[in-house]
UniProtKB/Swiss-Prot annotation:
GO terms for molecular function: cytokine activity. Pfam families: MARVEL (PF01284). One of its GO terms (cellular component) is cytosol. Keywords: Chemotaxis, Cytokine, Membrane, Transmembrane, Transmembrane helix. InterPro entries: Marvel, MARVEL-CKLF_proteins. It comes from Homo sapiens. The lineage of its organism: Eukaryota, Metazoa, Chordata, Craniata, Vertebrata. This is CKLF-like MARVEL transmembrane domain-containing protein 3.
């Protein structure tokens, strides 16, 4: 730091050891946990953000630069959901319907990537546009896989909720019915 400290540390560190200090998390607290990054959802979000960034760079370098907004927005949204899932914000902010927001993000991204990739490959002839289209098709597949998995999870959750409601309804009907009315 400037200005330099006029009084240096009076007791230097021992030659072979290191001074134990408090664990300062710093910026490491913002990094996702390794367990989350190794999970299927973490890998999908990493692939989505990586492919979106590569597609964005390809569109910036191509003559199809009119399409660069969609990959940029999808990159930022994928980073946001990666951060939100890694920091477990969905548990902290339960007022938001996280699975539905993630599902809609993936569906719209898959459709938009598919449309602009077809247009970039068919209409433009430079190599960067073709590369952006190919990476866009890969991103379409990754986003479609993600929304398929989210849809299956939501469908399982809703089936469990329906079966619990049905058993509760049957129990209340049995309790309210008069068995002596034969």
């Amino acid at each position: 730091m400037w200005p330099p400290d006029p009084d240096p540390d009076p007791d230097p560190e021992p030659a072979g050891g290191s001074r134990p200090g408090p664990a300062v998390p710093g910026l490491r607290a913002l990094l996702p946990a390794r367990a989350f990054l190794c999970s299927l959802k973490g890998r999908l979000l990493l692939a989505e953000s990586g492919l979106s960034f590569i597609t964005f760079i390809c569109y910036v370098a191509s003559s199809a630069s009119a399409f660069l907004t969609a990959p940029l927005l999808e990159f930022l949204l994928a980073l946001y959901f990666l951060f939100a899932d890694a920091m477990q914000l969905n548990d902290k902010w339960q007022g938001l319907c996280w699975p539905m927001m993630d599902f809609l993000r993936c569906v719209t991204a898959a459709l938009i990537y598919f449309a602009i990739s077809i247009t970039a490959i068919a209409k433009y002839s430079d190599g960067a546009s073709k590369a952006a289209g190919v990476f866009g098709f890969f991103a379409t597949i990754v986003f479609a896989t993600d929304f398929y998995l989210i849809f299956n999870d939501v469908a399982k959750f809703l089936k469990q909720g329906d079966s619990a409601d049905e058993t509760t309804a049957h129990k209340t009907e049995e309790e309210n019915s008069d068995s002596d009315s034969d």
